[in-house]
Amino acid sequence: VTIYWIVQSGKEDDIIENLLSKYETLSGHIKVVKKNPDVFPTFTEQYTNETVQNNSLIVECGDRSRFIGYDDIYIQEADVYSYSYNTSFDGEGAITSAIDYVVSEELPQLYMLEGHGEAELPATFSEQIEKENIEVSSFSLLTVDSVPEEADCVLIYAPTSDISEEEQKMLANYVTDGGKLLVMAGPTEEGTLKNLYGLLEAYGVEASDGVVIEADREHYAFQAPYVLLPDMAGSDITDSLIEENYFPIMPISQGMKITGSSGNGTVTELLTTSDAAFSKIAGYSLSTYEKEEDDIDGPFSVALSVEANSGGKIVWFASSSFLEDMYNAYSSGANGDMAMNALSSLVGESEAMAIRSKSLNYNYLTISASTSSLLKVMMIGVFPLLYLGIGICVVLTRRKKQNETV
């Protein structure tokens, strides 16, 4: 593998230079070649039509290559809340992904289901999929007799209408035949997607009508009981998040309950609510966060995985919104990382090539509503009163000593 470093003499970025030297030192199969655009002005034209900035890279192996622009290494993203830009360094992730791409003969195939009002994938998640070197295609079950054989995984993302019974059978057969299914679907304004969630019934999982509301203040964020901070169970999908103390956020979620063993496979809960959670039957029409007579008691699973006895696999996230850029940012990227871990496990990439970019700004601190209230009381009330009390004691002590001296 050859990494061409496109840079003018004296304009080398120290961080990129240090990173490239580590790649070259740690592997005898990687060679770094510096190309000065002043000396070789047309060199990059055979690889890309883009404008090539200083400190851009080209990774090549045989007849495959990938261009890495400077703005793919130092990533700037607009922050609509602070009207500023967040900058992160993604050199390691971009280079490792490019090396994986140029040395791979076949890339995983992800097929996205369409035809049910599915939302467009958020830009951040799409970029992560591209970085993982997974090729994405769209398809409709209405125009095929079965799921394409070349599909390594089928993704159903944020549908707004239900699938038909015939489509349900096709997807069920796909999993029974060893297929892999990734679903991100929460409640809709019309209610529960009965046929879609019916795929889980064969494995002893039932969906509860309505929207999950969390009554335990340690388990929801931003003073919004429908924005859940669920508990994470250890698994290949969640272990990396648990180790680094990241917490996914699940907004507007469908509640799922394991009703018993079906004999068709093994179900593993990934994210669960507290025992105090309940599902509001009113769904999107709810007028109060208080529990009412017909509401359904928790706890619920809001993310789970299924390993079918046939070899098929399902990973199910019961929220259509958790990958939206806003919630992903509030979770400091934990939502996107968990989804990518799930996708990587399904397509057979046990060691995900997607490496977290290093933020040059800051991450959001996600805390529960009760912790937020406690901090407010401490900062606004307790600490000022404490310092006031100490000050009064000091003044009285000094006056007492002065009086005794007199």
Name what the model sees in each region.
Residues 1-406:
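Short, surface-exposed patches at the edges or C-terminal ends of soluble domains, predominantly
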